[in-house]
């Protein structure tokens, strides 16, 4: 399969691309490469394009001949989005429908979109499932949900659309991120021997980056009829930030101090990943 991955030089992409190459796929990575290209080693079946997903002329040149698009590129969380909301909207929302439309016009067969579990907002239900109402708390999350609806409107028997709602990813990658909750706590515990927890009761569903990669591989291998127009949560555990801090302390060392402070960040997510298990047989392992 020939696959275009937007944002393929990012955190998840830097782990996903080598796995796809190992399986024999031909990969094109379209990325601004603002963190450099070295996270992706050269390969005979890998083409790296430094470019912007907002450039529609570029998309029209790049997309022909691809079987699938895996859309990872975005301003990737609330704090980053809020630094420049206009830029965030232009990348996360305004560029989305043109990418989908041009993909379909160029006979791309599958389009997989990386959304976010944050689209649910705060829910009282113990297990939040894919059919529940979206109540996003931020523009970042709202635009993620809006893009899901746009993608679904383009689905057909010849254009298979699938949305993944990842939990907060954690773990090591060549293009490492230290702004994700488990990675933040681990970094501070190791280097400072101290963890500052803001709030602490908020639930954060997490998923290891290896499992995140495997979920995309599983979707790509699944029969189109099973996944067309489907939305899947992907997560491992729904733990509070306090519980995560204790887990990190147990791994890093008993001398690590946990300091709790107040927070106005009331984002709290708790998701069920049963649907992806039932439909395509995917379960987290790490």
Task: Give the location of each predicted region.
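Conserved Rossmann-fold NAD(P)-dependent oxidoreductase catalytic core, especially the SDR/UDP-sugar
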Residues: 71, 97-137
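NAD(P)-dependent short-chain dehydrogenase/reductase
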Residues: 149-204, 209-217, 248-249
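Conserved catalytic-site region of short-chain dehydrogenase/reductase
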Residues: 78, 113-126, 139-145, 169-173
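Glycine-rich NAD(P)-binding loop of the Rossmann-fold in SDR/ketoreductase-type enzymes
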Residues: 54, 83-98, 134, 138, ...
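Rossmann-fold cofactor-recognition segment
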Residues: 44-55
């Amino acid at each position: 399969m020939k696959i275009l991955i937007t944002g393929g030089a990012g955190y998840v992409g830097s782990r996903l691309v080598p796995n796809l190459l190992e399986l024999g796929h031909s990969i094109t990575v379209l990325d601004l490469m603002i963190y450099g290209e070295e996270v992706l080693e050269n390969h005979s079946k890998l083409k790296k394009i430094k470019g912007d997903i907002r450039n529609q002329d570029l998309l029209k040149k790049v997309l022909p001949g691809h079987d699938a698009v895996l859309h990872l590129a975005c301003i990737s969380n609330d704090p980053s989005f809020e630094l420049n909301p206009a830029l965030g909207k232009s990348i996360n929302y305004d560029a989305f429908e043109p990418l989908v439309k041009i993909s379909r016009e160029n006979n791309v067969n599958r389009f997989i979109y990386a959304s976010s579990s944050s689209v649910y907002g705060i829910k009282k239900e113990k297990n939040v499932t894919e059919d529940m109402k979206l109540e996003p708390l931020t523009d970042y999350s709202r635009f993620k949900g809006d893009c899901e609806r746009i993608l679904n409107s383009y689905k057909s028997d010849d254009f298979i659309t699938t949305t993944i709602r990842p939990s907060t990813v954690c773990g090591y990658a060549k293009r490492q991120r230290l702004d994700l909750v488990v990675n933040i706590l681990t970094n501070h515990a190791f280097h400072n021997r101290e963890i500052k927890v803001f709030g602490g009761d908020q639930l954060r569903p997490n998923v290891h980056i290896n499992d995140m990669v495997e979920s995309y591989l599983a979707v790509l291998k699944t029969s189109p009829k099973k996944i067309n127009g489907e939305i899947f949560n992907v997560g491992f555990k729904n733990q509070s930030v306090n519980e995560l801090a204790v887990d990190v302390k147990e791994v890093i060392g008993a001398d690590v101090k946990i300091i709790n402070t107040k927070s106005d960040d009331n984002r709290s997510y708790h998701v069920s990943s049963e649907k992806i298990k039932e439909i395509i047989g995917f379960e987290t392992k790490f």
